[in-house]
Regions:
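Active-site glycine- and acidic-residue-rich loops that bind
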Residues: 168-172
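Histidine-centered catalytic micro-motifs
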Residues: 78-79, 188-196, 232
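Signal peptide processing junction and immediate N-terminal pro/mature segment
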Residues: 18-44
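Short beta-strand and adjacent tight-turn residues that come in two discontinuous sequence segments
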Residues: 162, 192, 252-254
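Short, glycine/acidic-enriched loop or turn micro-motifs at the edges of active sites
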Residues: 141-142, 195
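Acidic (Asp/Glu)-rich catalytic clusters
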Residues: 149-157, 174-191, 246
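Sec-dependent N-terminal signal peptides of Gram-positive bacterial secreted proteins and lipoproteins
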Residues: 1-24
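C-terminal active-site subregion of NodB/CE4 polysaccharide deacetylases
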Residues: 32, 40, 47-136, 142-143, ...
């Protein structure tokens, strides 16, 4: 009986020993799987981080506003008159030549500014695109409506016409209806006095009279404030400037042949004359070089 009991004890101990070894093996196997899973997860995370790092390295930052200019720089304010061919008359530019110039501006990324925008640029330092120009027309010829206006509309350009108010509806000048249509469609109408007087030759009282009367005539016709003027012949002196300011104008242009900048004075801004004799190369020079006359 004792032998039987001893034999049973030996068998039981043997079975217990085998069970422990299998359990240990199972735990070790699970540990390896777990470790392998952690390593794979870690590698995947590392790869993701690396991938993210590469992505962040390739993100392009927004460019600086290098394509803007401020009022420490100048701007070409272009001066036209009639858009119509006339032999040996530099004040009149042929339609084909005008369109060639406007197409060049459009194709080369130029922005046209209103006089409101020019004022904000010079007086309030509001930035504008580097390649900006201002288009102005003196006197108020009918061909500004018949020839220039369709081209300006085609390219989406802004412009300003300085109108001699006594000429409205006469001869080769713009009619009241044409002025209203132009004003409503991005072509600003401003003053060029009543009779195109040489302001520096008038008494102070006469200066005030023509400056105020032309302003009032246009304001009544167009139902808007008239704030800008072009001096006839470009003539002015200190008395003209004082009368212009006293009459309520905020900005005035002359015929001096350089770019406008804040050093000119807001009531004596320069302009760039575009002659009917100028070829495209000369036009390019004038809109790209502030001191093109030197």
């Amino acid at each position: 009986m004792k032998k039987i009991i001893i034999l049973l004890l030996i068998v039981s101990l043997s079975l217990f020993s085998v069970g422990c070894k299998n359990t240990t093996a199972s735990v070790n196997t699970n540990s390896k799987v777990s470790a392998s899973t952690e390593n794979n997860t870690s590698n995947e995370s590392s790869n993701k981080v690396s991938s993210n790092s590469n992505t962040s390295n390739t993100i392009k930052t927004e460019p600086l506003q290098k394509d803007l200019k401020y009022n420490n720089e100048g701007i070409p304010v272009l001066m036209y008159h009639s858009v119509k061919y006339e032999k040996d008359n530099p004040v009149r530019i042929p339609v084909e030549k005008f369109k060639e110039q406007m197409k060049y501006l459009k194709d080369n990324g130029y922005t046209t500014l209103s006089l409101d925008e020019l004022y904000d640029f010079l007086e309030n330092n509001k930035p504008i695109p580097k390649k900006s120009v201002v288009l102005t027309f003196d006197d108020g010829y009918k061909d500004n409506y018949e020839s220039a206006y369709p081209i300006l509309k085609e390219y989406g350009f802004k412009a300003t016409i300085f109108m001699i108010t006594s000429c409205i509806g006469t001869g080769e000048y713009l009619t009241a209806a044409q002025l209203k249509e132009l004003q409503q469609n991005g072509i600003d109408i401003e003053s060029h006095t009543v009779n195109h007087e040489k302001l520096n030759t008038l008494s102070y009282e006469k200066k005030l009279e023509t400056l105020k009367k032309s302003k009032e005539t246009l304001e009544k016709l167009l139902n808007k404030e008239v704030k800008y003027i072009a001096y006839p012949y470009g003539n002015y002196d200190d008395s003209v400037v004082r009368a212009t300011k006293a009459s309520g104008y905020k900005l005035a242009v002359t015929t001096k042949g350089t770019w406008s900048d804040k050093s000119d004075g807001i009531l004596t801004l320069d302009r760039v004359h575009i002659s009917g004799f100028s070829d495209l190369a000369n036009f390019k020079l004038r809109i790209s070089t502030p001191d093109y006359n030197k």
